[in-house]
Design a protein with these regions (language model features):
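Flexible, gly/ser-rich surface segments that form the specificity/activation loops bordering the active-site cleft
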Residues: 21-25, 108-155, 162-166, 182-193
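Structural motif corresponding to the intra-repeat A-B loop/turn of tetratricopeptide repeats
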Residues: 243, 277-278, 282, 316, ...
Length: 483
């Protein structure tokens, strides 16, 4: 009879001991763990794994390997709800961690708190597996070793048995805070030992201005988030404009505006994008106008917005539209640029004023603007060339035109490179107009050197004309033969 009583009593204490080992926080914490399914470019299942929320608005962590090659991903919560992964926010392929955002379908989701300090060697640890059941069996163990990663972060060796299906499950401390992301064991010690990358290290992963070139991120087809700071995000936008598809770039602009709603640059960039699609329908121009108006509302430097509006309208008119959209004329462009100048007469605004006046064939007004620019800190070969061509169109003294071209070429890199060589051709023709044939011939020679002899028959004809007028008859004969 005593033996019969002892057995149930022993079982009772074993059960009680097992329950005591399961911390109270497990029931709530397990709801933050989810399953992930990733899909390739053909929308076929690529990988399955685990992850967990670290913020109630959908920020989550998992392993990078799970996402490599994925075009989309879906998380499945412990309650069976499916939610898409919307943004990749950072990754490290060496330590196999990734940070991402889930487009949650609820106001908030259960989330774990990331531990601020690393547990000590010998501390208790719990691994929370993904489960759709009410009860959950935690894997318990100890922290065997703590090593440094990237200076202030940590990587853990755990005395704990882990199954393959537990990769990327959270590893918790006694307070119910997550300190690690479980990683696959390897080698001969897989029965008693596993590893965990620091959750704080995974949280530190970010998108930077240079992330567009990161091979680890490029191997994931899911959309990337923006850098957290405005300056970095603006650089990222600039780089993305030439590397992303139009649709992806538009989504990135939308993200920027949501993230930095008080930054006028986002509205200006999106307005320019909308205007570039204007040929597909007037509604795109309507959207551009709405963004320009919003930019004016939020901008601290309204002159910059007026300048960009004028610049866009100027470019629009240069494209020679079949039918002008509303008031997008040179006159309206000029009005906006002059509003910018009234606020702050920056040389770049005055240069745009000159360009618009030149397009309107108001050459006197354009020359006056270019002359102001040429006394400023942005004077360049291009600004002096603009002044020279404008003066030429005004039938100005040919020698004064040449003098402006001299200033243009003086500001070019010396010796003249192929990029600046066309200015030599322009000055050669202006020298001919000023009856300075020998100087024209020398300009043609300099051009020939700058382009390393890559010229055509027309070049030899013009140089022959200069040589003939300069009474260099043998040279003229040689060039006409080449022509």
């Amino acid at each position: 009879m005593k033996k019969i009583l002892i057995l149930p009593l022993l079982l009772f204490f074993l059960v009680q001991g097992s329950m005591a080992q399961t911390p109270k926080w497990v029931e709530k914490a397990k709801r933050a763990v989810f399953s992930i399914v990733t899909y390739d470019k053909n929308d076929k299942m690529l990988n399955t794994g685990n992850g967990f929320f670290v913020s109630e608005d959908g920020l989550a962590l998992s392993d990078y390997t799970l996402f490599k090659g994925a075009e989309r991903a879906v998380v499945i919560t412990s309650e069976g709800k499916q939610m898409p992964v919307s943004l990749i926010l950072g990754a490290n392929d060496m330590y196999d961690v990734i940070k991402f955002r889930v487009a949650i379908t609820e106001k908030k989701v259960p989330a774990l708190v990331v531990a601020k300090t690393a547990p000590a060697t010998g501390a208790d640890a719990w691994m929370l597996p993904y489960s759709t059941q009410k009860s959950i069996a935690c894997v318990t163990g100890k922290v065997k070793d703590v090593s440094k990663v990237a200076g202030e972060y940590h990587y853990y060796t755990l005395s704990m048995h882990m199954k393959d299906k537990m990769v990327s499950c959270p590893v918790m401390n006694a307070e119910g805070q997550v300190f690690g992301i479980a990683q696959k064991s390897s080698g001969i010690d897989t029965v008693t030992t596993c590893y965990a990358a620091g959750a704080a290290f995974a949280m530190s992963q970010k998108i930077s201005a240079l992330s567009l070139g990161d091979p680890a991120l490029k191997s994931i087809g899911i959309r990337k988030g923006l850098p957290e700071t405005e300056d970095q995000a603006l650089v990222y936008l600039f780089m993305a404009s030439s590397s992303l598809s139009g649709e992806d770039y538009e989504k990135l602009l939308d993200d920027f505006i949501r993230q930095f709603p008080a930054n006028a640059d986002g509205y200006l960039r999106r307005a320019n994008y909308y205007a570039s699609k204007g040929k597909d329908g007037q509604t795109w121009y309507d959207k551009a106008v709405a963004d320009f108006n919003q930019a004016l509302k939020v901008a601290q430097k309204k002159d910059d917005v007026y300048y960009n509006i004028g610049k866009l309208m100027y470019a629009y008119q240069l494209s020679k539209p079949e039918k002008t959209y509303k008031d997008w004329t040179y006159d309206t462009a000029l009005k906006n640029v002059r509003q910018a100048i009234a606020i702050d007469p920056l040389p770049i605004y005055i240069q745009m004023e000159g360009d618009i006046l030149f397009a309107q064939q108001d050459y006197a007004g354009a020359l006056a603007a270019y002359e102001k620019v040429n006394t400023s800190n942005i004077a360049s070969p291009a600004t002096f060339f603009s002044a020279a061509k404008t003066k030429e169109l005004l039938k100005g003294d040919p020698k004064e035109v040449v003098a402006l071209m001299d200033s243009c070429i003086t500001r070019c890199p010396q010796p003249i490179t192929v990029d600046f060589a066309p200015y030599l051709l322009e000055r050669a023709q202006m020298n001919m107009n000023a009856d300075q044939a020998r100087n024209a011939m020398l300009d043609y020679d300099a051009y020939h050197t700058a382009v390393k002899g890559e010229v055509n028959d027309v070049f030899y004809y013009y140089r022959e004309q200069a040589a003939l007028k300069a009474r260099q008859f043998q040279r003229a004969l040689d060039d006409i033969a080449k022509a």
